[in-house]
UniProtKB/Swiss-Prot annotation:
The active site is at C250. E1-like enzyme which activates UFM1. GO terms for molecular function: ATP binding; metal ion binding; UFM1 activating enzyme activity. GO terms for cellular component: cytosol. It comes from the Eukaryota. Belongs to the ubiquitin-activating E1 family. UBA5 subfamily. Signal peptide: none annotated. GO terms for biological process: neuromuscular process; protein ufmylation. Zn(2+) binds at C226, C229, C303, C308. This is Ubiquitin-like modifier-activating enzyme 5.
Length: 404
C-alpha cells in the first residue's frame, strides 16, 4: 500500500515539473516566440508601421475628436466577459483605454468557442484571467484589473460597489463608465442598483435567446429610465430565472449578433467618453429584417428602486439651460387678396425717377475715372417728343426704298 502511494506521489511530482516547464503560451500568456511590445508613454500621430496609435490619432486630423489621447485618462468597468463582454474589452483595449476593470466568475469552456475572442487552449481558465492575459499582450499600455466573483451575492455586492466607486484612473475616484454585458436579469438588477446608488452612468446590453436580435441602452440615473423603471416580466413578477431553464436546452448564440451588439456598445461608449457625435439612449438590432430601432425611455415616477426616485428629484431640481428663441418677424402682405406680397401698381401711376448717386468728395489731385452725365427730366421729355415726331410709317419707308 505504501509503495503504491509512493508511486502516485512520484507521478504527481513529475506532472508538476512538466507543468512548470510547459511554455507559458499554453495558458494564455505570451511566450518567448511572441514577445509583447514595450509600453508607449504618449500617443503619437506619426504615420509609421510601428505606431499602433497612428490610425486612432487620425481622428483628430479629420476633426472627429478634439483630443483622442484623453482616452488614456478613462476607466471603464465591464461586468460579464462572455460573448459581448470579451469583444467589448478587446475593442476598448485596441482603442487604448486607460483602465479596464473586468468582473466575471465563470470559466472558459469549449462551448464558448462559437463566440469571439477566447481560444481552445484557454479552456478551464477563469474568463477574467484568460481575458487579462490576452488583452495585456494586445496592448500593454492598458491597465487591467480583474475580479473573479459573483456580484449578485450580498457580500460581493458591497465589493463591487466600492470598486466602481473608487477604482477610477485616479485612485479614490469612480470609474467613468460601467458596461453591463451579463446574460441574466439578476446581475442587471444588481448593476442597476449600484449605479443608481452611486449616481454612475452605465450601458446595458443584451442579445436575445434566439441570437437574432440585440440592443444597447444608455442609462443616466434620474434622466433616463433605469432597468427597474420598465422591467421585463421575469423581474416584475419576481420569477426565479433558474426555474425557466430546462435540462439539455441552451440559448442560441451567434458571433455575428454578439459582435454587432458589442460594436454598437463600444462605439457609443467612445462617443460618450470622448464627447463626439450623438450617444444613442436606446439602439436595437433585428438581424432578420436589418431593423435598427432608436428611442429614449423616460424614468418611471413610481419606480421600485428608491435611489432612482432620489436621482429623478435631483435631476428635476437642476437648473435647466436657458434657450433664447429668436422671434420671427412676420411680414404681412401688402394686399389682403395677395398672399405672395406682390405690390400692384396702376398703369397711369407716375414712374419715380431714380435719385442720382451723390458724387463723393475727392481729395486734392484725385479725380474719378468716369463721371456719369446728368440728365434732367426736361431733356428726357424733349428726347421722347423728338423721337415721336420723327417716326415714319412702314409704307413710307418701303416707298423710299423703291425710288432709290
Amino acid at each position: 500500500m505504501s509503495h503504491a502511494i509512493d508511486e502516485l506521489q512520484a507521478i504527481i511530482a513529475d506532472l508538476k515539473t512538466e507543468l512548470e516547464t510547459e511554455p507559458k503560451s499554453s495558458v494564455g500568456v505570451a511566450s518567448n516566440s511572441r514577445l509583447a511590445r514595450d509600453r508607449i508613454d504618449r500617443m503619437s500621430a506619426e504615420v509609421v508601421d510601428s505606431n499602433p496609435y497612428s490610425r486612432l490619432m487620425a481622428l483628430q486630423r479629420m476633426n472627429i475628436v478634439k483630443d483622442y489621447e484623453r482616452i488614456r485618462d478613462k476607466a471603464v468597468a465591464i461586468v460579464g466577459v462572455g460573448g459581448v463582454g470579451s469583444v467589448t474589452a478587446d475593442m476598448l483595449t485596441r482603442c487604448g483605454i486607460g483602465k479596464l476593470i473586468l468582473f466575471d466568475y465563470d470559466k472558459v469552456e469549449l462551448d464558448n468557442m462559437n463566440r469571439l475572442f477566447f481560444t481552445p487552449d484557454q479552456a478551464g481558465l477563469s474568463k477574467v484571467a484568460a481575458a487579462a492575459a490576452t488583452l495585456s499582450f494586445i496592448n500593454p499600455d492598458v491597465e487591467i484589473e480583474t475580479h473573479n466573483y459573483n456580484i449578485t451575492t450580498v457580500e460581493n455586492f458591497d465589493r463591487f460597489l466600492d470598486t466602481i466607486s473608487q477604482g477610477g484612473r485616479i485612485a479614490g475616484q469612480p470609474v467613468d463608465l460601467v458596461l453591463s454585458c451579463v446574460d441574466n436579469f439578476e446581475a442587471r438588477m444588481a448593476i442597476n442598483a449600484a449605479c443608481n446608488e452611486r449616481n454612475l452612468n452605465w450601458f446595458e446590453s443584451g442579445v436575445s435567446e434566439n441570437a437574432v436580435s440585440g440592443h444597447i441602452q444608455f442609462i443616466r440615473p434620474g434622466d433616463t429610465a433605469c432597468f427597474a423603471c420598465a422591467p421585463p416580466l421575469v423581474v416584475a413578477e419576481n420569477i426565479d430565472e433558474k426555474t425557466l431553464k430546462r435540462e439539455g436546452v441552451c440559448a442560441a448564440s451567434l458571433p455575428t449578433t454578439m459582435g454587432i451588439t458589442a460594436g454598437f456598445l463600444v462605439q457609443n461608449a467612445l462617443k460618450y467618453l470622448l464627447n463626439f457625435g450623438e450617444v444613442s439612449d436606446y439602439l436595437g438590432y433585428n438581424a432578420l429584417s436589418d431593423f435598427f430601432p432608436k428611442m429614449t425611455l423616460k424614468p418611471n415616477p413610481q419606480c421600485d428602486d428608491r435611489n432612482c426616485i432620489v436621482r429623478q428629484k435631483e435631476f428635476q431640481a437642476r437648473p435647466k439651460p436657458v434657450v433664447i428663441e429668436e422671434k420671427a418677424v412676420s411680414e404681412e402682405p401688402l394686399h389682403a387678396t395677395n398672399e405672395w406680397g406682390i405690390e400692384l401698381v396702376a398703369e397711369d401711376a407716375p414712374q419715380s425717377n431714380p435719385t442720382p448717386a451723390e458724387t463723393p468728395v475727392m481729395g486734392e489731385g484725385l479725380r474719378l475715372a468716369y463721371e456719369a452725365p446728368e440728365k434732367s427730366s426736361e431733356t428726357s421729355e424733349e428726347t421722347v417728343t423728338a423721337a415721336t415726331a420723327d417716326e415714319t410709317s412702314l409704307e413710307d419707308l418701303m416707298a423710299q426704298m423703291k425710288s432709290m
